[in-house]
Amino acid sequence: MGSLRKAERKSAKIRLGLASPSGGGKTYSALLIARGLASSWDKIAVIDTENGSADLYSQLGDYNVLSLTAPYHPQRYIDAIHECEEAGMEVIVIDSITHEWSGVGGCLEIQQNEVDKQRVKNTYTAWKVVTPIHQKFIDAILQSRCHIITTVRSKTDYMQVDDNGRKSIQKVGMAQVTRDGFEYELTISLDLDENHRAVVSKDRTNLFEGHPAFIPTVETGEILKQWCESGVNEKEDLLASLKNCKEKADFDTLATKYVNLLITDSAGRRVFPEDLRKAIRARYEEVTNTKKQ
């Protein structure tokens, strides 16, 4: 059982989603926000599944592009995220996540392939195979030590309604082309209209909630960065807490207490970054040597 403590907002990494139909300005808006979040353009990476759309805005700055082509299996997205992390990126733009869901080799195709294998067709059991694969993709986004901006295509959503006994199809808004509920995983979710104006659909930061539509800029990213850094700095908190580590059990609890600082190494293990590992190792050796004396 965990110990009861006062609520305290930690410094965080943003998880921001941009949704719009084709031509809504998702890539451009994502790059501007990313620049506000990053210390420089070369600390931004775009995982590009949109046939080179990220390169269209190279005049903005010297950002990095990792092109991802079919098949769009979730694991390929995960590997791309880890590659960007290991390269020292501060912001990762995933443009877009739609292909992970509905693209060639994506989740919908994986599900259909599972159904096709069955003698007695059962879509429910096929989803039991797909859901864990998709969840690993979500976890890679949520657990990343980088700020992450996702773009997703949206389309007009319709539903059948009964109007005095007559069936009719009515437009009910826009639907994101990804698994239902993805936006609930995010810190902030913005819908872009045809004029590239953003409307907030979800905002845990309360920075934009209730505001009129606005055009995302570099300043938008700077505002978000300031919010992220206004909480308790977990890295500094961990380093300060090392002086209180006097038993092996104290060191064993660090990964649980500071789970947000963990990264995924090339072997797929969740570990602290190298600088923190060195600090922890040095303190552990200091404690061990003291006990031997």
Where are these regions (language model features)?
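Interfaces that engage single-stranded nucleic acids at replication/repair/recombination sites
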Residues: 1-20, 24-26, 35, 51-54, ...
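Phosphate-binding/switch region of NTP-binding enzymes
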Residues: 21, 131-221
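Switch/connector loops and helix/strand junctions flanking conserved nucleotide-binding motifs
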Residues: 54-57, 100-108, 157-163, 197-201
